Every structure is written in structure tokens, then in C-alpha cells.
Amino acid sequence: MEVLCSPVNGKATMLENVHDEMFSEKMLGDGIAVIPDENELRSPVEGTVTMIYETQHAIGIQTDLGTDILIHIGIDTVQLHGVPFQTKAKVGDRVKQGDLLTIVDWDMIRNKNMDVIVPIIVTNKRVDQMKTNGDIRVGEP
């Protein structure tokens, strides 16, 4: 069994609470969302970085067992053209759980009246169990 850990400190919530139907209706897969309270976003799993959007608002990682994870950084942040993100990872990088992926300027995102919530989605497998509310720390399942 693979364990998906939180990529950021904050408050865990159900995907149904995300104000974007792609996530709340689980069109991309199941998972959780975290309302972040720090600017460092870390890998939730060990695996390989498979995708980083040009605008740096989303990162994909595949585990060694083939689980595809999508980390979407904020809602509608694609419109910011990468400005609030200092991405440290590159496509093809091997990452361990807890490795730094990107640093996010949440204040800039909030100042643009955008939601800072971070959906973490398993796109190709069923999710059996997850924390769906309350405080969560980097590395906690």
C-alpha cells in the first residue's frame, strides 16, 4: 500500500470543498486538498517528476508503483503565468517524500483574489483512506 503525505503544512479538507468543479466533482481523480500556511511545497511521495506546467501552477509525480499524483497549486493560478512560483524541481527528477518542489508567494495569489487551496489528486488509482479535515503537517498521511 502506498502512502500519500501532505506536501504542505496547513488545514486538510475534502475535495468537495474546493471551489472548482474539476476537483470538487473529482473529474481528475480522488484525493484531498490543503489550505496552506507556509510557502514551501514538498513532494508527497517518492517518485519521478513527470510534469510541470509551463506556468508552474501544477506538478505531476509518478511513484515507483505507477501511481500518478497531481499537485495543483491554487485555483486559477494558471493566469499568473508562473510569477508566484519558484520551482526547484525539474521534469525527470527523482524525488523523495519531503523534497522541496517549489516555493509559493501565497500573498501575491491572495492579492489577486485567488484561492490558495492545494488539491492533491491521485489520477489513476482508487484512494482508500485519507485525512479530510483538521491540521496537517508536511509528511503526514
Can you describe what each PLM-predicted range is?
Residues 1-141:
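Contiguous, well-folded functional domains in the mature portion of proteins
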